[in-house]
Amino acid sequence: MVTGNFNLEKLLKNLKKKTGKKAEILTMNEKVEKEDVVQNEANEQETVTKKNEEGDIVDKKDETPEVEEKIDKPETSTRKLEIHIAFLSEKYEADIGKVISKFEGVKTCKVDVENKKVVITGDFDEEKLWKELEEKMRKRIVKMEKEKKDDEPITKDEENEIDRGVYMNPSSDDEKEMARWMMFSDENPNACSIS
């Protein structure tokens, strides 16, 4: 719990930087000072009613609601970024969520495995986020690219050079029995070999 006068944004930024984890504001108690009450009462007295051309009574606030809303709301540069990731699956969901949620300025991160996309909202630098994702997920991205290359059609020249992965099992009983006795210790640590 933190009390006193301080800059909330700087405090959150320092907490995120020092701990490397996501920090959030759970509750915020604001003290109402006497000056604020006096200002609110003065604003209420300023709302004067007057008649418009049709004869209806209109408050002064109702005349320009758009201007007052813009003044009351501070501008934030919250953006929404949607990333499509081809290799997204359940086993990478947690890893990607961790990388993105630890990034500075990210407010929410939703990982949709079915549609293979990630939706990120917050105030962050897109280029830095891309670099961070590439850096952390490089091995997995390269792995998926290799798998995609294998799916491409093979020309006739390449067919002769490729090992088709066909291996014949020992056909005679002697070879099978010899293979049973000469088992490597890496495959079965409890086995013994008799030579």
UniProtKB/Swiss-Prot annotation:
Entry-linked Pfam families: HMA
Propeptide residues per the UniProt entry: 193-195
Swiss-Prot/TrEMBL keywords: Lipoprotein, Metal-binding, Methylation, Prenylation
Biased composition (Basic and acidic residues): 47-76, 145-157
Region annotation (Disordered) ranges: 36-76, 145-172
Residues anchoring lipid (S-farnesyl cysteine): 192
Molecular-function annotations in GO: metal ion binding
Family listed: Belongs to the HIPP family.
Protein name: Heavy metal-associated isoprenylated plant protein 18
Species this protein is from: Arabidopsis thaliana (Mouse-ear cress)
